[in-house]
């Protein structure tokens, strides 16, 4: 797809650190035996084998060359409960990617939730470990913390949170929470995720927060946060909208060209 290559080139030219290409893994349900509950309701359950996934990465690398600088492995297991049995399959997959493309090839996995201690030991670079709305991010369930202690033991650059439904009222709290937790990668959007169990569920959301980029007022916050000057930006923005104050004598005329909204203070003497 020529457009994929072009968009990746534009992103890199604009300052993006890496361009990674999307490949599904569908929880590696293809590795499960017939009749296993983990295969239930997974579309094309036998399609996404290790061989197929590796083939998709090779196609991306062949077609896009140096622009393909990593892979985004979507729909990865979190390693908890029955999913623990698929950790060896993910280890095999990730180890083969690493052996084929080297340490500079960025491997990103998307579990969408916190991951088990055994999953943390795999050789990925970044894990998208949160993918919910701002309400869930700001009011986390302490029984299932966003970043458990075993994850906090790793560098912040290993963790990536995606927060939907961000508003003008809560975005500061979202950034503050990410800083407090030690999450180095953050994608915020005012887009909403809506799933209808009767119309495809998680596999075909009726409301997709990634269908369009975030609104401009949200986009304008991300780079300042990444570079550490968001508080300064917000202070400057506030000064820009603060009304001007003009001190005049009791009978002094307002100067021509005084901006609308200027506060006029009259001196008694």
Which residues does each predicted region cover?
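Extracellular/surface-exposed low-complexity repeats and stalk/linker segments enriched in Gly/Pro
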Residues: 236-269
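Glycan-processing catalytic domains of CAZymes
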Residues: 1-233
